[in-house]
Amino acid sequence: FNCCLINIGDMLENGTVMNGKLIETPKSFQVACTVMTQIISAVASSQYGGQSVDIRHLGKYLRKSHDKYEAHYRQKYGDTITEDVLEEFVNDRLMDELKSGVQTIQYQINTLMTTNGQSPFVTLFLNLDKDDPYIEENAMIIEEILNQRIEGIKNEKGVYVTPAFPKLIYVLDEHNCLKGGKYDYLTRLAVKCSAKRMYPDYISAKKMRENYEGNVFSCMGCRSFLTPWKDENGEYKFEGRFNQGVVSINLPQIAIIAQGDEEKFWTLLEERLALCFDALMARHHALEGTLSSVSPIHWQYGAIARLGKDEPIDKLLHDGYSTISLGYIGVYETTKLMTGVSPVSYTHLRAHETRSNL
C-alpha cells in the first residue's frame, strides 16, 4: 500500500517481532530510539509510500532513563551528596543519552537502506500535547531534534549539509505560538531551523481541531491526511491506519488538449475522473484478500494491526479504517492555459472563476 501512521506507541509499549525475534519494551531512551529506527526500516521495506511517527511516544523512555540514573546515583552515593548534586549528575547523564538517542534516529534513517533501495521516507511529528504526562521530556526531545537538524549531517567531504530525512512537522498550539506561552522557545528554535534547513513544516493545532473533529495528528509521510475514524469503543484512532493508494490527475494536460474550450475541458475532466476512479478501485481490489503473512511487521506485529497469522486484511480496507486518494496537479498552469491570464490576477474575472471552479 501507499503510506501510513505507524502505531509506534503500541509497538514500543507492547513489543514487536522482527526477523522472527521478539523485541520487548525498551528500558531506556537510547534503546527506544534504536528500536524505533529498526521498525521504520522494516515498515518502509514493505510499502511504497511514506510513514510518520509521533515523537511523543519517546517521552516515557526518557523518563525511564532519568529514573534509572537517579536510582544508580542514590545507591552509589547514598546521603553523601546533596539533592542538587545528585540531580546535576543525573541530568548530565540524561543529556548525553538524549543527544546520542536523537543522533541515532538521524543517522540511522539517513544511512539505512530499505529493500526498495532507498532511505525510508519518514516524517517525525513534533507535537506537545498539554495533557501529556511526559510533556517536559518531549519538549527536551523536540529541542534536541531541532538543534541537531540545524547542525546538519556531514557529507563525504566533511561539510555539514541538510539531511533529506526525516522530514519534520512542528505543531503550533496555544502554548508555543509566540504569545507568551511556556514553549515559545521551541517555536523560535523551529523558525531558526526552517530558515537554515527548510524544515520543519508547520501545522496549526487550532485549524486541525476545526477540520478533524477536535483531533491533531500527522500527515502520512509527506502530505496525505487520514479522515476521522472511531473504533468499537467510540475512541478516535489515527495511528495504525493507512492509505491504500493514490492516483493523481494531470490538469494541465487536459487544458492543453482543450485549447481554451471550457466545454471540452469539463467533458475531458469527467472522462479522466472516471478513469482515475477505475484505477483506484483496481488498487483497492488488488489489496482485498491479502493475508497478514505478506508483511508481518504491518499486519501481525503492530505497525498497522495485530492480526493472526494468514488472516485476511480485508476488514482494514473497508468502513473508513483506511483511505484511498485522488490527487491533482497544475491548477495555476491550467488556469493560465484556459484563460491566458495568471490566476493570481484577481481583477480578471474569468481567471478567478476558472480557478475557483477547479
Describe every region a protein language model picked out.
Residues F1-L317, I329, E353:
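Catalytic alpha/beta active-site cores
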Residues E333-V341:
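Well-ordered alpha-helical scaffold segments within catalytic/enzyme domains
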